[in-house]
Amino acid sequence: MLAFLAFGGRHTWFFGDDWAFVLDRQELLDQGRIVDFLLGPHNEHLSSLPILLYTAIFRIFGVDSYAPYLVCALLAHGGVLWGVRTLLHRLDAPAGWRLVAIVWLGFGAGGAENLLWAFQVGFIGAIAAGIWAVILVLTGAPSLRRDIGAAVLCGVGFLTASTVVPLVAATAVVLLRARAYRRLATVVLAPGLPFLLWYLLVGRARAPQVAHPESVMPQFFTTGLTFTADRIVGVSSIGVLVVAGAFVLLRSRPSSEPGRRDLVDVFFLVPLITFALAAYSRSYLGLEGARASRYVYAAAATIIPALTLAAHQLYESRRPARPLVGLLAVVALGASATSYVDFRAGWREYSGDTRPALELTPRLASAPLADPEYSSKHPAHPNATRQRLERLIETDRWNPTTIWSDDVQARVSLRAGVTQRETLDAAIARSYPTGATLRTGTAEPLDTGGCWRVVAGWPDESARIDLGTRGVIELTWPTASVVLRIVDRDGTELASGTVDLSRGSWIGFETLVGSVELVAPGPRIEVCNIAPTTRAG
């Protein structure tokens, strides 16, 4: 299963928060700010162990390949799968049903985001640590050795991500109900109090300060639960009914094993606590945030063993229900696999768009008016600025060697090689003399030095000027927008984009391929800082 997922994720690449660990944390380490490097929160999470993991991989492999990072996330996923298998084995589920659960959760059960994004190694790893802590506490004969092992795992989880909190909290409820106060102190309080102290002194103060809209929280909570249940079951609108039915079925079964009932309670408490915490910390994102696939995975890690156990129990006890149980199992497995395939296709398309932008951006570092803090004009990569990417190359942490097509290079040139300013010092403008070849009409000088009016030959024709490969121009007419096209030697368009002049009438540009052509929305255009030459027929 893990080998298949590794093969499926071969086209993924660094995204979003990956860069926070690769760039931000490495800068803190290089500056000697060890406390900030290790204990500074990522959002509200204490992520010390994932940070150390990313640092080790970065120092060995750099960012030439995403595979070493993704493999670690998949190994954490393997820890979750083996934990689910162990829980079901301890609950006497047959091997066939254990295999169903592994395949079901193996494809993410609607939470495939975690299987394609290496950064989620912390998210998944904390869940794995929590599941194995539950196994030590609630299966087998109680012993101090097992409790200490569980406490260590809880501590590992706290140092990895806050996704361990629901598992620890659910375990605490069970121990408190059993009045096992010594075990509660060992397993929960010993690792939990240092984490709580960190959160109060460091995490809460330095995490992003966001609103917590109380009016949205209840709906966020219910939306998250219903959406998650539907994704896990694979059928819209019945997920909550199926999960609730499984709870009733499992809790109504007479059992002489108190540990079995405790495990069932933990299985169903974890999603409730997960979405209660998410409703408090993420409700500012709106209800769409409740549908994030990563939360589906967090709930599925305990809901799937519960549903598998209920399915096995129903299958064995009620023969007429077997066709329905089999049908629901097939639908759920198919939905999980389909969700993975769909998410993988979208992720691959997304990586195919953003990776060239990040790889080619450093090659446009000397573009006129270039901003060193430029971050590929994509909100998902705010940490990956041009300056930082250049530094990775200079320090041999990155050697981008991908050969991109002319079309791709042209698109990136329009995104990363075009910069606008509202004002510009005349000396700077003169340092970028821009040649101009008329594509249409004629040019006549204006009274303002270095400014020209270009008029097309026909009233219904757009004025067009070939500006070469790099330069700086000022547009005085039109005032709304113009189009920049990148064309090859034959005049074939490679890419084009509209420039909104309300963001600045001064435009600096450079292209990696072809030349830049300025196209007016009408027959007239007035442009400064150019030196028109002969007309190109």
Please name every model-derived segment:
Residues 1-44, 54, 59-99, 173-175, ...:
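Intrinsically disordered, polar/acidic, low-complexity terminal segments
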Residues 66, 99-127:
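Aromatic- and kink-enriched transmembrane "portal" helix at the membrane-lumen/periplasm boundary
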Residues 77-88, 129-141, 152, 168-176, ...:
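Transmembrane alpha-helical segments
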Residues 100-101, 258-284, 329-332:
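Transmembrane alpha-helix segments characteristic
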Residues 115, 123, 287-312:
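Hydrophobic/aromatic-rich transmembrane helices and adjacent perimembrane loops
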Residues 135-157, 183-186:
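Short hydrophobic alpha-helices at membrane interfaces in multi-pass membrane enzymes
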Residues 146-162, 167-174:
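Membrane-interface alpha helices of multi-pass inner-membrane proteins
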Residues 165-192, 196:
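Perimembrane helix-loop-helix junctions
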